[in-house]
């Protein structure tokens, strides 16, 4: 399956640059990785937010068909990883849109998490919440992401997260904040409760539901099993400040000497480093700024089947082109990542054993190429560590999960990563024609229908 030309064009038109200041403080990454181990286990995480966690309503607005409540609470993340959130993000804010009449004795509520660039509430309110009031008498709770809207740091430009670590802070905060809101909704007598989101919002909703100790409808739209592909093989990879990431990786040895060793195995596409990896990369993979970055850099043969790491053996592709793909074809069609994922699992300490003397014998272009490749591997590793759903608990009832995906999504590559159906046996995946942008613009009705279907499935299985 090809990738959407509209996705590629839209990305080129945007000015936003990501991670302009680099990886983030090494101390912060260490704390986040340790915290990820805690929230990756439902038995441990479910007790982090108490069932009576305080939530405050600031304003109630009466409208003809609904009530709109604005509220706030202190993010639990500020208690467990103090000082890691920007001061502007510590107070979580939300908007709750409630119908004046319900269709039955149930009072269903769906929490919507924001996608990339979705500041404040108006998009989700207009495109999802208000139609859901009209179509199904279903309430919606819109949580504002850390780093977005009123929670955006003063020195942040638009949606440009300054550090890679900011994304992990956002994810950890949303998991705990979602738990606080779910507890509050239960206390207020609402139910059934579910979660959804589009793009990044769908992925964050997946992580949040994985830590909820009860069956819950989950409808992730335009998201997949990990964010590593988004930032290494998707069109967003072009918006990343790779030069700063490379520079920091090579000037601060803490990344390869300490942080690498904190990354955990999460399945066949894990980060464990192998000696064979560099041998499979073409020597002229020299421009991370090119849109076809990974079709050159990750030029490896790959199949969709899952291979056990013990039995995994790399095999070279016949004649894989490394020329620029025509008509915007990139990444999924030419980048073959299974061999990468297998070789990465063989030896975690490859960087530690790298011979610096031989490195200095390389010419400048070769050194630059190696820096690019190793920074890319490290990005994949840290993204898988904190965002791969296989590093989190399986939701209590995967049959209540309906995943909506675009067949030609250039933002959320599915090639080379584990399928959600493998990680969450029993979930349903619905595929839409087209790419990420066209689905977001024109398929909102199908997203809402998936929400209604998942809630109906819940009532059929669990209604009293």
Curated annotation (Swiss-Prot):
Residues carrying sugar: 341
Keywords attached to this entry: Glycoprotein, Secreted, Signal
GO cellular component, one term: extracellular region
Protein localization: Secreted
Segment forming the signal sequence: 1-24
Homology family: Belongs to the AB hydrolase superfamily.
PANTHER family assigned: PROTEIN ABHD18 (PTHR13617:SF14)
Descriptive protein name: Protein ABHD18
Organism field: Mus musculus
């Amino acid at each position: 399956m090809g990738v959407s030309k509209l996705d590629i064009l839209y990305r080129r038109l945007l000015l936003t640059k990501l991670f302009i200041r680099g990886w983030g403080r090494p101390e912060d990454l260490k704390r986040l990785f340790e915290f990820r181990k805690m929230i990756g286990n439902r038995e441990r995480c479910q007790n982090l937010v108490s069932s009576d966690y305080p939530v405050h309503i600031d304003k109630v607005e009466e409208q003809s068909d609904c009530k709109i409540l604005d509220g706030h609470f202190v993010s639990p993340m500020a208690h467990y990883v103090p000082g890691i959130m920007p001061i502007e993000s510590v107070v979580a804010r939300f908007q709750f849109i409630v119908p004046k009449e319900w269709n039955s004795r149930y009072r269903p509520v769906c929490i919507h998490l924001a996608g990339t660039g979705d500041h404040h509430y108006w998009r989700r309110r207009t495109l999802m919440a208000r139609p859901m009031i009209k179509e199904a008498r279903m309430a919606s709770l819109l949580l504002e992401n850390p780093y977005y809207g009123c929670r955006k740091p003063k020195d942040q430009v638009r949606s440009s997260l300054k550090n890679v670590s900011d994304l992990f802070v956002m994810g950890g905060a949303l998991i705990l904040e979602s738990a606080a809101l779910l507890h509050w909704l239960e206390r207020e007598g609402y139910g059934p409760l579910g979660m959804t989101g589009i793009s990044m919002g769908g992925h964050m909703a997946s992580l949040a539901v994985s830590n909820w100790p009860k069956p819950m409808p989950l409808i992730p739209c335009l998201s997949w099993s990990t964010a590593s592909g988004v930032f290494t093989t998707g069109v967003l990879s072009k918006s990343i400040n790779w030069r700063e990431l490379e520079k920091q990786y090579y000037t601060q040895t803490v990344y390869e000497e300490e942080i690498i060793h904190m990354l955990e195995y999460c399945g066949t596409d894990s980060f464990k480093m192998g000696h064979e990896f560099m041998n499979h990369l073409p020597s002229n993979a020299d421009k991370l700024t090119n849109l076809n970055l990974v079709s050159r850099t990750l030029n490896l043969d790959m199949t969709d089947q899952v291979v056990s790491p013990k039995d995994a053996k790399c095999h070279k592709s016949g004649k894989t082109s490394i020329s620029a793909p025509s008509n915007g074809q990139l990444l999924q069609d030419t980048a073959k990542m299974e061999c990468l994922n297998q070789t990465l699992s063989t030896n975690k300490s490859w960087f530690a054993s790298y011979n610096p003397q031989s490195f200095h014998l390389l010419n400048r272009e070769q050194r630059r190429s190696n820096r690019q490749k190793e920074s890319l591997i490290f990005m994949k590793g840290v993204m898988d560590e904190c965002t791969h759903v296989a590093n989190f608990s399986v939701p209590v009832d995967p049959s209540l999960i309906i995943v909506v995906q675009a067949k030609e999504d250039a933002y959320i590559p599915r090639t080379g990563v584990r399928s959600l159906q493998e990680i969450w046996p029993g979930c349903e995946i619905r595929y839409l024609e087209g790419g990420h942008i066209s689905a977001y613009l024109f398929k909102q009705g199908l997203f809402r229908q998936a929400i209604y279907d998942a809630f109906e499935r819940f009532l059929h299985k669990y209604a009293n």
